[in-house]
Amino acid sequence: MGNNLRRAAHRRLGLALVCLGVWRCAAEPAPRTGARDAALSYLLSRLSPFQSEGIYYELGEDRIRLSASPEGARFIPSFELPDDAPLYPVLTEYKRVFVYDAAVEVCALVLAGKHSEAKQLLRTIEAMQLLDGGLGFSFNASGDTFYNHSYLRSGTVAWAGYAAVLYGHETGETDFRAFAGRIAEWLERQQVPGDRLLDPRAGLIMGGHGQWAEDYSELTKGKRTWAGTEHAIDAYFFLRDYARSQQAPSMRSRYAAAADRVKRALLEQMWTEPAPGLGRFVQGVDRQSLNLGKALDCCGGWGALFLLAVGEREKAAATLAYTAETFATTFRPAEADEGVSVTGYRPYAGHNEGIDWDRYPDVVWSEGSLGVALSYLRLGRRDKFESIVDNMLKLCTVPGDPRSGVRYSRYRQDLAAGPKAPVDTATVIKDLTQAPSACCTAWLLLVLESAEEGNFGKFWGPDQ
């Protein structure tokens, strides 16, 4: 999320795209165990060997050298688009992988007990780690060596570290201890020092590095000094659990203190209550002022999960109430052959990301909707959890069947009316694709596995 919608670039097209997660829904609700197995089948069927000499380009003649891919490294392509789609050369032809997607896939596979496959994905993520400990946003995994290594987002880096820590906790292995340690040091350097009376960002995590031009034709390098709520939440869970994994008392206290600073900054600086019984986190802050944008991941998704984890149950209920009032929506197809109606949540409200989202009230964003579902489950509202899950199953390419992949989003302004239908790019909202997404399918699996008794609280669980 974060710059919520994930950006990608390609040397020939200079385009970018968003990727985020999703989960399940069914025209007629399928047995949830069957949906879980089907989502797992989708991911496992797309695992491919990752083979790279470790030399990558980004723009022009620049090159960086990283580690060659280790034995056993594998990847899952983030998107499946037909070869006549405008974004096919960017997302599908060279098997584009978004690092965030891969991290979500690792978490889902770990909870599903597929530790060997999770390790194979982590091997690939580890091979892409930069010398300073960070991770670029996305890379081509087959037939081309593009790596968006100057565009980093702290939330993505934190997710990769969290996936490694979760894997280590569940397996007892230490293979990725050094990898996670370098991420911890990188995030520590992004944490804003000082007192919030002097700097409203104090304690939060700066956004990362790099910024693409609006048309993705130019990349401005350098640190992004704004701090976003979503990145802070991602970093909190990683820093907290990384601290728990440390045996040395000095390391435990060092990173526990960093996590605590993030937690206090979020609760004291970013929380607002616009009306009685309603609450939310603002979207971010720079040196001068708060960004009051309305983003789903700062409210009923990531925000509510964070509040529940830190024991702020009343605030979690308030932000879910705000989410229902502000982001709930329904996609209704214009034609019968465009699928079925789906109720879920839109990514933004009001003006955000250069768009008036209130002009597009029917956008259903699957990843964010899944986060809301998991929040309701942990609040004890299994009825709401099941209702959202059943709706998300309708977002499968074949409604109700996760083996066909879960769409990234759904709305009337279709990216494509069908698998081989003509595409009118003018109808695409921002960078939201309606193609099936590996990350979205992984989110479905992650949420369903999190509902299992043996897994409850393993992912982004409560403070202890």
Sequence positions of predicted segments:
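Non-membrane alpha-helical segments in proteins
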Residues: 100-112, 120-124, 159-163
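Extended ligand-binding clefts on enzyme/binding-domain cores
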Residues: 30-87, 92, 96-100, 127-130, ...
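Bacterial N-terminal signal peptides that target proteins for export
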Residues: 2-13
